[in-house]
UniProtKB/Swiss-Prot annotation:
It comes from Methanosarcina acetivorans (strain ATCC 35395 / DSM 2834 / JCM 12185 / C2A). It comes from the Archaea. Gene3D superfamilies: 3.30.720.200, HUPs, Isoleucyl-tRNA Synthetase, Domain 1. This is Valine--tRNA ligase. NCBIfam families: PRK13208.1 (NF009687), valS (TIGR00422). HAMAP family: Val_tRNA_synth_type2. PANTHER family: VALINE--TRNA LIGASE, CHLOROPLASTIC_MITOCHONDRIAL 2 (PTHR11946:SF93), VALYL-TRNA SYNTHETASES (PTHR11946). The gene is valS.
């Protein structure tokens, strides 16, 4: 092999910049045409384009890239697409901040243009970070949800689902964020425990307890448990609501908890989901006391225009003044918050668009999908089981996919766009036909679609749905975080079933969250945020990718620790030193030499290493098939450092530098095979380093090569056992030299090995000594040569006399003292008096004599090693 100069130190940034410039990214492209390879389509998460590709994104994309690179090497036609989920409130807020406007101060089209421009710039920033981290994205299959080429599919999916009866329009209670002024789905509600007050209020016949006195204007009934005898005489009677004066009926319902508060509750429209259930069940009237901005309406009387907080304070004051409020108690309450702004959500009844939830179909599809880890499926099952309301998909914003709907001004009928009209914005275009009533005057739908309506068709989009390509659903895998199982995973399954009647993917692999170095969730307020750019600048992309691989098992949260990155960087240098040493001995070795190398020319330690190497390939393949990145990379790193560097290279140096051409050729073959195989195994994890390694084996990219196959013929327990013995013997001899203060390359007179059938050449080379295999069992004579007093025993007993006892012991014949110790009692004379000692008072040092020579014997399992001095 030819060898260019290999520097001693590995310059990661220089290498990574070189390959970023050299790589032809078309090698990552998916082939839509006829291809003998099985397809492997990844339903990649489209991140929100904030301009910051944060460390949580980076961890997820590391996982995806490990999968994509591995599957390509396994012979799959891989698609690793990249999408961008553009629409959403944060962009609207940022545009308002940048331009010093509100969205209602400019035309809708102009505001959307501002949002698009900001988003496009943010995408470019994030794309640069992704390229720097070495992700093998198929950029020929990039998609941007704000582009007409994508949102036309979102609109088509809406039209088809509406026509098929999956979507409907209704005035129905929905979760509402007063701050964002939009409806939100239940999946977008997050819960937090907060302290509130439980207020005890006199009604004219019963006392009620409520946490929402500000909604008394919307009280439409009072409920008690039918088994609660305290109120049985009042059930069905009218009750007057204090301050507001409306009369409501006392109803009995088993959902009321008699133990809570007074056992009587106020039903308002709407304080919570239970109010909605009762409202529907009993056909109660609807009183809208709260508007979309979170202020009280005319229904609240003198409290009109107040915020909820202001109204609560005023109502409580008035109840106290009138003598209706007779007690208050602190209560810890689970409060639903908007996932975007943390504002407590309200429930308003507004005309909205909904998607019907197919509970049974979603659960069945979830069972057909393979989950990694398996226990994550329970999260989807639990969420599906708790879904009482359909998915509210309409939002009161501007920067989102328009709902392709108009309303006839004359008869009020819905006019839905035909597919041939799409993409379309009903606020800028009118229908291309008249209403069934004959009218041509329409009001456009001003609401837009929930952004999950865009991202929930990613599996359909990347599989070729509604394109010139053949449909390839289901895709093979969905990689995503556990925090969006109830949204992205849930909605994608729902939509794939509704539109195509198929599951969206064969498998789903779940990643955890990234925690800061302090173990807490990363946040600017805690000052524990680390960016991928910080790591790549200080260390390298490959070091960052190693952290991603070994940080934790699939599904678990991963803590970012700088020491893990430092360890990763050290491994790169260690692996580089291994590679550099190996290549220095392969200058006269050609790949053809490896193809024709006879296996019987291998020595024991060669077969030992190749057996372990093939076991490593087998382990790595099985673990990566199960998406176990941490155990895979740890196994590769452990083999390279501990098996190859610490043992094999030390054992074969004698052959590599020696005069035996056949032994040297065998070692060269093993070095070539092992380093080349390691470059392939490392390729999915540290692509820059692996490419640099492989570039001296071939002009082709390592990322276009085939994953190494297991050679079962080279796996041998017998070879490994013999190799372990060679390793252990060599290690014991090295420790022996170290204990005596000898240099490790200092020669010994001779090493004799009994009870072993192994090659001795590598032991001789590693110990710089003559080594001989001996037949039969060795005979040893153990001659006592010194009495060593045990001062831990003698000192406390004899104190000042201990020195005299030691002197007397050392004057005795070691053999005689040994004989006395064996009998259980030692008697010596100290200053003319007999002194008796226990056997533990002394240690007898013995010399080992074998064949008339003084030797040392080393304890090695399965063999006896004799060192001739």
């Amino acid at each position: 092999m030819t060898e260019s100069e290999i520097p001693k130190e590995y310059n990661a940034n220089e290498v990574e910049e070189k390959w970023m410039e050299k790589w032809n990214l078309s090698m990552y492209h998916f082939n839509w045409g006829e291809d003998p390879r099985p397809q492997y389509i990844i339903d990649t998460p489209p991140p929100y384009p904030t301009g910051n590709f944060h460390i949580g994104n980076a961890l997820n994309w590391c996982y995806i890239d490990y999968i994509a690179r591995y599957k390509r090497m396994r012979g799959y036609n891989v698609m690793f697409p990249q999408g961008w989920d553009c629409h959403g409130l944060p962009t609207e807020v940022k545009v308002e901040e940048i331009h010093g406007i509100t969205k209602n101060q400019v035309p809708r089209a102009e505001f959307r243009k501002m949002c698009r421009e900001l988003t496009a710039g943010n995408i470019e920033k994030m794309r640069k970070t992704m390229l720097r981290l070495g992700f093998s994205v198929d950029w020929s299959n990039e998609f941007v949800t704000m582009e007409p080429s994508y949102f036309v599919k979102t609109q088509k999916s809406f039209v088809r689902m509406y026509n098929d009866g999956h979507i409907y329009h209704e005035d129905h209670p929905v979760n509402w964020c007063p701050r964002c002024e939009t409806a939100i789905a239940f999946a977008e509600v997050e819960y937090e425990s907060r302290q509130t007050k439980l207020n005890f209020v006199h009604f004219d016949k019963v006392d009620i307890a409520t946490t929402r006195p500000e909604l008394m204007a919307a009280c439409v009934a009072v409920a008690v448990n039918p088994k609660d005898e305290r109120y049985s005489q009042h059930i069905g009677k009218e009750i007057t609501v204090p301050i507001f004066g409306q009369k409501v009926t006392l109803i009995a319902d088993e959902a009321v908890e008699p133990e809570f508060g007074t056992g009587a509750v106020m039903i308002c429209t709407f304080g919570d989901k239970q109010d909605v259930r009762w409202w529907v069940k009993y056909g109660l009237p609807l009183v809208k006391a709260l508007d979309k901005q979170g202020r009280m309406t005319k229904a609240a009387g003198k409290y009109e225009g107040m915020t909820l907080a202001e109204c609560r304070e005023a109502v409580i004051a008035d109840l106290k003044a009138a003598g209706f409020l007779y007690d208050q108690k602190s209560l810890e309450q689970n409060v639903g918050l908007c996932w975007r702004c943390d504002t407590p959500i309200e429930i308003l009844s507004e005309p909205q668009w909904f998607v019907k939830i197919n509970h049974e179909g979603i659960l069945k599809a979830a069972d057909e999908i393979k989950w990694y880890p398996e226990y994550m499926k329970v999260r989807l099952q639990n969420w599906t089981g708790t879904m009482e309301w359909d998915w509210c998909i309409s939002r009161q914003r501007i920067f989102a996919t328009p709902i392709p709907i108009w309303y006839c001004k004359k008869c009020g009928e819905v006019m839905i766009a035909e597919e041939s009209w799409l993409p379309i914005d009903p606020n800028e275009n009118t229908p291309k036909k008249a209403c069934a009533c004959g009218s041509t005057e329409f009001e456009p739908e001003t609401d837009v679609l929930d952004t999950w309506m865009d991202s929930s068709i990613t599996a359909l989009h990347v599989s070729g749905w509604e394109s010139e390509h053949e449909m390839r659903l289901p895709t093979q895998i969905r990689p995503q975080g556990h925090d969006i199982i109830r949204t992205w995973a849930f909605y994608t399954i729902l939509r794939s079933l509704a539109l195509e009647g198929k599951r969206p993917w064969d498998s789903i692999v779940i990643n955890g969250m990234v925690l800061g170095p302090d173990g807490h969730k990363m946040s600017k307020s805690l000052g524990n945020v680390i960016s991928p750019e910080e790591v790549t600048t200080q260390y390298s992309a490959d070091a960052f990718r190693q952290w991603g691989a070994v940080g934790g098992s699939t599904g678990s949260d991963v803590m970012f620790r700088w020491k893990d990155v430092v360890s990763a960087s050290r491994f790169l240098q260690k692996m580089w030193s291994i590679y550099r040493f190996s290549m220095s001995h392969l200058k006269d070795f050609e790949p053809a030499d490896a193809e024709n190398f006879p296996p019987d020319a291998l020595l024991t330690i060669d077969r030992w290493l190749l057996s372990k190497l093939n076991k490593l390939v087998d382990t790595a393949t099985k673990e990566l098939d199960g998406y176990q990145f941490d155990s895979t990379f740890k196994a590769i790193r452990g083999f390279a450092w501990e098996v190859l560097a610490d043992n094999y290279l030390e054992l074969v140096k004698g052959r590599l530098y020696g005069e035996d051409p056949e032994g040297r050729k065998a070692a060269q073959y093993v070095l070539y095979t092992t380093t080349r195989t390691l470059s392939l195994l490392l390729a999915p994890f540290i692509p820059f380093f692996a490419e640099e390694m492989y570039s001296r084996f071939s002009e082709e990219s390592v990322h276009t090569q085939t994953w190494p196959a297991v050679n079962e013929k080279l796996i041998s327990e017998e070879a490994e056992a013999a190799g372990e013995m060679i390793k252990e013997i060599t290690g014991e001899v090295r420790r022996y030299k170290s204990d005596l203060g000898m240099a490790l390359n200092a020669p010994l007179k001779k090493i004799e090995i009994y009870n072993a059938e192994i090659d001795t050449g590598d032991i001789a080379g590693a110990t710089n000594s003559e080594v001989e295999l001996m037949a039969g069992a060795p005979s040893f004579e153990y001659v006592p040569v010194e009495v060593k007093p045990n001062m831990g025993f003698l000192g406390p007993r004899f104190r000042k006399e201990a020195g005299a006892v030691v002197k007397a012991l050392q004057a005795e014949d070691p053999a005689a003292i040994e004989a006395q110790a064996a009998s259980g009692k030692i008697t010596i004379t100290v200053n003319g008096e007999a002194v008796k000692l226990e056997p533990e008072a002394v240690e007898i040092r013995k010399e080992v004599i074998s064949g008339g020579r003084e030797v040392d014997v080393l304890d090695v399992k399965g063999a006896v090693v004799v060192i001739v001095r």
